[in-house]
Swiss-Prot record:
Pathway: One-carbon metabolism; tetrahydrofolate interconversion. This is Formate--tetrahydrofolate ligase. It catalyses: (6S)-5,6,7,8-tetrahydrofolate + formate + ATP = (6R)-10-formyltetrahydrofolate + ADP + phosphate. It holds the Pfam family FTHFS. Belongs to the formate--tetrahydrofolate ligase family. GO terms for molecular function: ATP binding; formate-tetrahydrofolate ligase activity. One of its GO terms (biological process) is tetrahydrofolate interconversion. It comes from Desulfatibacillum aliphaticivorans. ATP binds at residues 73-80. Its EC number is 6.3.4.3.
Length: 587
């Protein structure tokens, strides 16, 4: 039975649902897991993925369902809520269903956006643990990452203080000769802290470190988080960590975590991080939570490991891609599925009347400010014009050979006439379409949606990648820009073109993934341009190299790995009851 999502806050719904939440022992029985495959951690548990996958290696995989979205408003269009709602709807239909979602960062949770647990009757529980650190994965990543910085800055200090003979005699280390102006790594913290974007470290005497400019980034922007999302096992994780480039020496050669002899210790911090955490929906469908990388510089997905486990345990496995189909889905399609070898059956395109109205020329949507009446009152013209963005995204999904299902994530202000326009446009573009009221009604409100996905899963598809790995970097970027974003072409800055040419000539980078860096608020590089922009070219100003994750990131704009905290952050409304320890105010 659904809770009253209009009157109850998300944290209140979670608290009520938690009263009947299965224990780790009950989950082991429900999922058919053996005792040594569950690693209990309080009310939650991690699972030993290697043992499960090895035991079930001969079991056929379930149906693989990805959830993406049209280009969103700054408010987001409810992909996580839709993912959870689909699990609940499939559960209501009696299906063996589960999923895998990303772990949220403490930064957005305490800032304007809030947590990523879903919402209303379609959320993950227990919400407090989910929102406030879960089973410690992000903390482990922070310790591992910052240990790398400690190793590098200490090494720079010792190399400054000792000559080559002293360095060898006292420490047994060779001189790395790191260039302080070419340090790639920074420190990380799991908050939005704009005051830490640019800092100076090492002030004091010769034993107080190496004086230089440095920086902090948000924890989920760490290359370690990206590695966690794509690693296949602990050996792969350790190898990738040792290959991370932390800086360049004064001759221009990369300096890695392996060179600093710190990579293995960093991997030791993440020995448990590699195992997914088991949670559930408010209606008690199981869901793994694992990894949480940015979708702008990284893959923007939960982990390959969680998907591999879920596909063995569930007949229907639901996962979510960050941002919209042009970014998150494109990386799911051409990176995650290529790395994993898994082939999806269905992609759900989350659509809202609100976002379609914005793309149709509606007033500007600003996070933290009241919506214009155009978004809460019927306006068929705006919806019809805005459907162009949805139709474009359907085309992107179909280009991958995956069966698309449009989910109208229906709000109470949406009208039947508005939804009818969306359905007509979606079906004309070759997609199934279903309305869903999962936020309000949980699984019961997602039955039409679940049925559409079940039907789509039974249809054959012709999944294939957009480009072969043999294709050169600049050709890949041009193909993504023209066939996914709708650009007329690509303009490379001279420095970026030179770097791309160097990377294309070095066979070491041939199998690196192409990880585009672009705004999520537009199909173009300009967040102001809505709908489906015409007559534009994609500018590439730089190419970032993530040698551990094996990503090459062409940048179509500036990025900051440290968001800022807004003027009305969520932490102002979060509290804890001293008598019970229960947390209130999360959303």
């Amino acid at each position: 039975m659904a809770y009253n999502a209009v009157e109850m806050a998300d944290w209140q719904i979670s608290e009520a649902a938690e009263e009947n939440m299965p224990t780790p022992e009950q989950w082991a029985e429900k999922l058919g897991l053996q005792s040594d495959e569950m690693l209990p951690m309080g009310r939650l548990a991690k699972v030993d993925f290697l043992k499960i996958i090895d035991r079930l290696k001969d079991r056929p995989d379930g149906k693989y369902i990805e959830v993406t979205a049209i280009t969103p408003t700054p408010l987001g269009e409810g992909k996580s809520t839709t993912s959870v709602g689909l699990m609940e709807g499939l559960g209501m239909r009696g299906k063996n269903v589960g999923g895998a979602l990303r772990q949220p960062s403490g930064g957005p949770t305490m800032n304007v956006k809030g947590t990523a647990a879903g919402g209303g009757n379609s959320l993950l529980i227990p919400m407090t643990e989910f929102s406030l650190g879960l089973t410690g994965d992000i903390n482990d990543i922070m310790n591992a990452h910052n240990l790398g910085m400690v190793a590098m800055t200490a090494r720079m200090q010792h190399e400054r203080n000792y000559n080559d003979e002293q360095l060898q005699r006292l420490t047994g280390m060779r001189r790395l000769d790191i260039d302080p102006t070419r340090v790639e790594f920074g420190w990380i913290i799991d908050f939005c802290a704009q005051a830490l974007r640019n800092i100076v470290i090492g002030l004091g005497g010769r034993f107080d470190g190496y004086t230089m400019q440095s920086k902090f980034g948000i924890a989920v922007g760490s290359e370690l988080m990206a590695i966690l999302a794509v690693a296949t096992d602990l050996a792969d994780l350790k190898e990738r960590i040792n290959n991370i480039t932390v800086a360049f020496d004064k001759s221009g050669k990369p300096v890695t975590c392996g060179d600093l002899e710190v990579g293995n210790a960093m991997a030791a911090f993440m020995r448990n991080t590699i195992n997914p955490t088991l949670m559930c929906t408010a209606e008690y469908q199981p869901c793994f939570v694992h990894a949480g990388p940015f979708a702008n510089i990284a893959v923007g997905q939960s982990s390959i490991i969680a998907d591999r486990v879920g596909l063995k345990l569930f007949d229907y496995h639901v996962t979510e891609s960050g941002f919209a189909a042009d970014i998150g889905f494109e990386k799911f399609w051409n990176v995650k599925c290529r790395f994993s070898g898994l082939k999806p059956h269905v992609s759900v395109l989350t659509s809202t009347i609100r976002a379609l109205k914005m793309h149709g020329g509606g007033p500007k949507v600003v996070a933290g400010k009241a919506l214009d009446d155009a978004y809460t009152k019927e306006n068929l013209e705006l919806v019809e014009k805005g459907c162009e963005n949805m139709v474009h995204m359907i085309g992107v999904i179909r280009k991958a050979g995956i069966n698309p299902v449009v989910c109208i994530n229906r709000f109470y202000t949406d009208t039947d006439a508005e939804c009818a326009i969306v359905r007509k446009a979606a079906e004309a573009a070759g997609a199934r379409c279903a309305e869903s009221k999962h936020w309000e009604k949980g699984g019961e409100g997602a039955l039409e949606f679940a049925d559409a996905v079940i039907e789509a899963c039974e249809e054959g598809n012709d999944f294939d990648f957009l480009y072969p790995l043999e294709m050169k970097l600049r050709d890949r970027v041009n193909k993504i820009a023209t066939e996914v974003y709708g650009a007329d072409g690509v303009d490379w800055a001279p420095e970026a073109a030179a770097k791309a040419e160097m990377l294309e000539s070095d066979p070491k980078y041939a199998d690196f993934a192409t990880m585009m860096v672009k705004t999520h608020l537009s199909l173009s590089h300009d967040p102001v341009k809505k709908g489906v922009p015409k007559g534009w070219r994609l500018p590439i100003r730089d190419v970032l190299i993530y040698s551990g994750a094996k990503f090459l990131c062409p940048c179509a704009g500036t990025i900051s790995l440290m968001p800022g905290t807004g003027s009305n952050p969520a932490f102002r409304r979060i509290d804890v009851d001293p008598a019970t320890g229960k947390v209130s105010g999360l959303f």
